[in-house]
Design a protein with these regions (language model features):
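Alpha-helical transmembrane anchor segments
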Residues: 7-41, 184-268
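Transmembrane signal-anchor/signal-peptide helices with a preference for the extracytoplasmic
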Residues: 67-88, 241
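Structured inter-helical modules in multipass membrane proteins
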Residues: 96-187
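N-terminal (or domain-start) structured segment
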Residues: 270-334, 340, 349
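Bilobed "Venus flytrap"/periplasmic-binding protein-like clamshell domains
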Residues: 272-300, 306, 365-432, 526, ...
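Pocket-lining segment of extracytoplasmic ligand-binding domains
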Residues: 335-337, 345-347, 375, 412-512
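A structural signal for short loop-to-beta-strand junctions that line the ligand-binding cleft
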Residues: 350-362, 367, 486-494
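Segments of small-molecule ligand-sensing domains
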Residues: 488, 493-567
Length: 567
């Protein structure tokens, strides 16, 4: 009988449950007043001190009981709030894991995505209905065990894959921890002894209302108000107790949102063409910019049937080689590196890439060299013979520094002692005095640059001089620029040179995929600007009308021509 009654109570909406509690106490109050009021008039007739004693005891008791009610409401609210936070953490970790699968090679990428979608379906369709019946199912554990086996069987082959894999495992553990908190809440409730205290205390309060000697109408009004207050407070406690079962319960909404925003399109578009966009280091600019571009492209998947997957890579040189080898369909590349590959110059003299094609231009990238405060290095000529980090082999910065060093005409003994550290390791090495300077080719403002400047009060090095002027004059893909000091709390701008970040592909790339990139980014440019500070000043003219390092892909050219953007 008790189980049926609780099941009926749990089936009520919050409004219905509130009405039941308030109505119960209100009716009890009225019945008691109707029965007791005539007798109390005879008892206290001519004995005012009896009524005074009742009021005094009721006031003190009521204060203590009100404190108990308040504490119980706060406690149950905190339990519900904590559970909401755990569910949000589970959803956030799930979303990050799903996006991070882009960094994994096929077929592991598709297998992980399918397993994560299956887990999400199970949580929404199986776990939560079971929670409402105070049951915990084992299916979620089985699915997580399968995902764990997939993750631990993977061996990263690049530094970017290693970093993403480490983050993937961290978020996987965070999701498991949040899930365990959710499961423990299935059986979380207020102890029965406290419920007995609440109900007995409420009934004693009602009895005190019956014993007051007032005129009938004021006593009914006062008793009704007090009864409704008791009903509301106990309703709140009851509704938030068992936070996965009752009226004010925690639902799977955050996880449902992850499915709708991140996964649903893949269930509804199983035949969508998936293309990979090579980006850069996770701590750099290319990776978040690549995620932003893919997010824009994937919004129109129902229209063009193309899914974009952003992959972390060492950078420009790696992206070009991967496009050539067919491992990537698209890549974000420095225009100077792309130009050298297309023309067969510099590092590409023995391996030209005449099939390389441009898709769209992005933002200017400036050569940014940082040194510790107090360093004697002020200009690029001062770097001769110094220890300089120029980024990982395969990055655009590495290739750009080779071009600059050649233009400077240094002898062998004057050339820099280069290192190939990633952004975080380079920052630590600079602050520790293990290197003299750190070079980046990056769009501004940059979080990596900001972190380095604040880590050990670093300064910028000017990239200027006759040799640099001659280099810019001979290279159409380079231009003079300056790093705005105001972006980093500095008083002066620093002269430098720059290039552009460009999305590149191969001449043989699927025209539908190229057109999807071009159409989506142009149509959503206002949204794209909000995705990363480096994209904030992006214009259609710069994206389509600039000097490309290689000819436009025919599909991109056709899109821009149809939009009237090509002159």
């Amino acid at each position: 009988m008790r189980r049926l009654f609780l099941a009926w109570m749990n089936s009520l909406t919050a409004v219905e449950l509130g009405v039941v509690f308030c109505g119960f106490f209100f009716v009890i109050s009225l019945i008691g007043i109707a029965l007791v009021h005539p007798h109390m008039r005879r008892v206290v007739h001519g004995q005012r001190q009896v009524n005074d004693v009742v009021i005094f005891v009721a006031a003190n008791y009521g204060l203590l009981y009100a404190i108990l009610l308040g504490l119980m409401v706060v406690a149950t609210f905190q339990i519900t709030k904590d559970l909401q936070d755990h569910v949000a953490m589970e959803a956030s970790s799930l979303a990050t894991m799903y996006r991070s699968t882009d960094a994994y090679p096929e077929p592991l990428r598709s297998e992980l995505r399918a397993q994560l979608r299956d887990y999400t379906h199970y949580v929404i369709d199986k776990d939560w209905p079971a929670h409402r019946q105070m049951r915990v199912l084992a299916g979620g554990d089985h699915r997580l065990q399968a995902i764990r086996q997939k993750l631990f069987s993977f061996e990263p082959k690049t530094p970017s894959q290693e970093e993403i894999h480490r983050e993937m495992l961290r978020y996987f553990n965070a999701m498991i921890a949040a899930r365990e908190q959710r499961l423990s809440a299935v059986f979380s409730s207020i102890p029965d002894v406290l419920w007995y205290a609440l109900w007995i205390g409420a009934l004693v309060t009602i009895v005190f209302l019956w014993m007051l000697h007032l005129d009938l109408v004021p006593q009914i009004v006062f008793g009704g108000i007090t009864a409704v207050f008791l009903g509301v407070m106990i309703f709140l406690i009851y509704a938030m107790d068992h936070p996965l079962q009752r009226a004010v319960s925690v639902g799977p909404d955050p996880i449902q949102s992850v499915y709708d925003l991140e996964m649903k399109w893949e269930d509804t578009n199983p035949k969508a063409t998936t293309v990979s966009l090579g980006t850069g280091e996770l701590k750099g600019v290319y990776y978040p910019v690549g995620l932003a571009i893919c997010d824009i492209v994937n919004r129109d998947i129902n229209k063009h049937g193309v899914r974009c997957s952003a992959e972390g890579t060492p950078g420009s040189v790696y992206n070009l080689d991967a496009i050539r080898d067919g491992e990537l369909e698209f890549g974000i590349v420095q225009s100077d590196v792309a130009h050298a590959a297309y023309k067969g110059e510099g590092a590409y003299a023995d391996k030209p890439f005449p099939e390389l094609r441009s898709v769209l231009a992005l933002y200017p990238e400036l050569i940014t060299i940082m040194v510790r405060e107090g360093s004697p290095i002020h200009g690029i000529a001062d770097l001769a013979g110094r220890r300089v980090n120029v980024g990982r082999l395969g990055s655009g910065a590495f290739a750009t520094w080779s071009t600059i060093e050649t233009a400077l005409g240094w002898k062998n003994e004057e050339k820099t002692q280069i290192t190939d550290l990633g952004p975080v390791a380079a920052s630590n090495a600079l602050c520790a005095g293990e290197i003299d300077a750190s070079l980046l080719v990056v769009g501004h403002p940059s979080d990596t640059v900001r972190t380095q400047l604040s880590a050990c009060a670093a300064n910028f090095v000017a990239v200027s001089g006759p040799e640099i002027d001659a280099l810019v004059s001979s290279a159409p893909y380079l231009r003079k620029a300056s790093i705005p000091g105001a972006l980093y709390g500095l008083t002066a701008d620093t002269p430098t040179i720059g290039t552009n970040a460009v999305v590149m592909t191969s001449e043989s790339e699927n025209a539908k995929a190229v057109a999807a990139f071009a159409q989506a980014t142009i149509a959503q440019i206002s949204n794209l600007r909000t995705k990363h500070p480096a994209l904030a000043n992006l214009t259609v003219e710069e994206m389509t009308g600039g000097s490309f390092p290689a000819p436009l892909h025919p599909a991109a050219s056709q899109v821009y021509e149809d939009l009237g953007l090509l002159k």
